[in-house]
Amino acid sequence: MALLQISEPGMSAAPHRHRLAAGIDLGTTNSLVATVRSGSAACLPDAEGRVTLPSVVRYLENGGIEVGKTALSAQKTDPLNTVSSAKRLIGRTLADLHQNTHYLPYRFGDNQRVIELHTRQGVKTPVEVSAEILKTLKSRAEETLGGDLVGVVITVPAYFDDAQRQATKDAARLAGLNVLRLLNEPTAAAIAYGLDNASEGTFVVYDLGGGTFDVSVLQLTKGLFEVKATGGNSALGGDDFDHRLFCRLLEQNGLSQLNEQDSQLLLSLVRAAKEQLTTQTEARIQATLSDGMPIDTSISRAEFHNLTQHLVMKTLEPVTQALKDAGVGKNEVKGVIMVGGSTRMLHVQQAVATFFGQTPLNNLNPDEVVALGAAIQANVLAGNKTDGEWLLLDVTPLSLGLETYGGLAEKIIPRNSTIPTARAQDFTTFKDGQTAMTIHVVQGERELVSDCRSLAKFTLRGIPPMAAGAARIRVTFQIDADGLLSVSAQEQSTGVQAQIEVKPSYGLDDGAITRMLKDSMDNAAEDMAARARAEAVVEAESLTDAVNAALELDSDLLDAKELQQIRQGIADLQGRLKDGKAEDIRSAVAKLSRSTDNFAAKRMNRNIQRALTGQSVDNI
């Protein structure tokens, strides 16, 4: 029995009219737009028959803007006003790029929150640059299809964080596009291959693009695409292979510093050489620099492979981790899908084939497969698809949680949870009379907040004054289909509420996610010990506060010996808090608790007597 469909909010359910939707692969090097026509997905060409649009934008003196091939051809002569690889900059800060800015031929601004590029038309951000690319693709699609697009699906690397995803949506909004969904690039590839070939089983999507690397382990069955695990590196791609070849060229010719024009010239030449080496055993680089210095260098395929083999091996580290996360052995993988133009490099194909012991799948164009999958997804979300429906389940790559008293990280949504999702958990106050609570949202696998990544903070105010532990605050985490997080907190008795959309103003450092996962495994034992101690400290401080408050009110119930015994227990406990282990602290807590049992009984009797004073038997 086929499942009934429920359209997304704002989507028309009218079945009789085909609604124009498109899939966009917003790439580091090239971008594409595709759509479904007559039941088949296809990339849309420009007026000259080219489906790929170079992701390059040039700002002209007359106020005009060039996008694509014409802009690309001007990189050598007008590097400061010609921006490429904006995808590597979007949603990031200068601090994230500290390792590679020296070979990027741009004039960066000093803004520490958002990357700014100085051009002849003023300051431009990566969001604005990306918007120009999206505008061009939008125009191409609407001219080809003969109508306005109702929406688009835009693909992003699976390892894009909230800031990078939100920045991508901002670029689409500037371009006048309605984003139906952001779709992870490996997932888009799986959609294209799964639907075309009706494949079932466990597949790995190996996606090496111009600026990013992603890997996804997917379980494909009839009607269900489930992402079992993801991994990757948001700062590893074909550009890094170019950079190694670029540095080698500088070394061979005794060059240390170049002006922007010469940098762009040599970068374009090493990219061309890299592409030649996929079909030729040797490539030659010839140029004349602006100072008249001639460059004439040859590089063999073997030399290029040796120069960049460490980058290829670097991609296999997250592949290994993703397989481990999914609980899948290499021998259980039915097929490996190669995505991204950088997978055309022969030593990449050879390394992947050796690792998995099988030839990777490549019957779809690796440059187009992501856009095709996005087009298929857009067609479904626009309400055009009527048969053979399937379900897509994506996952979040890192755990999300919040800080609890004592600096502990409480995980609300574990890593590799299927999204979209929503989860709630109840929390309470730590102090008597507490009327506000700070919600600190964190990301990571470690047990202590200090070892996790801080995402956002907000404050819930208006909590009714109560005894510690009496209030009930429900915190809800929601991740939408684009992987964007919103967090809300509500006090249950009054309904007072606060919430926040998590939009960090900065991205993760290069390889940060991989490091976070590795650190969580390497430090698991130490983290659990630290958490146990922190929990013991919280318990000790709570008991100490309660006993001190009771002594202020009712110490007259105790004789000198009892009072001294309790005060000594408090002192012993405070001493253990300084450098004692978790078991030492808990032992001192138990000792203090036992010493106050008689005191607690006396206080209860007094309170009962106070409650009964002046009451008649009939009223009891």
UniProtKB/Swiss-Prot annotation:
Keywords: ATP-binding, Chaperone, Nucleotide-binding. NCBIfam families: HscA, PRK05183.1. Disulfide bonds: none annotated. Chaperone involved in the maturation of iron-sulfur cluster-containing proteins. Has a low intrinsic ATPase activity which is markedly stimulated by HscB. GO terms for molecular function: ATP binding; ATP hydrolysis activity; ATP-dependent protein folding chaperone; unfolded protein binding. Belongs to the heat shock protein 70 family. GO terms for biological process: iron-sulfur cluster assembly. This is Chaperone protein HscA homolog. Signal peptide: none annotated. PANTHER family: HEAT SHOCK PROTEIN 70KDA. Pfam families: HSP70. InterPro entries: ATPase_NBD (IPR043129), Heat_shock_70_CS (IPR018181), HscA_NBD (IPR042039), HSP70_C_sf (IPR029048), HSP70_peptide-bd_sf (IPR029047), Hsp_70_fam (IPR013126), ISC_FeS_clus_asmbl_HscA (IPR010236). It comes from Neisseria meningitidis serogroup A / serotype 4A (strain DSM 15465 / Z2491).
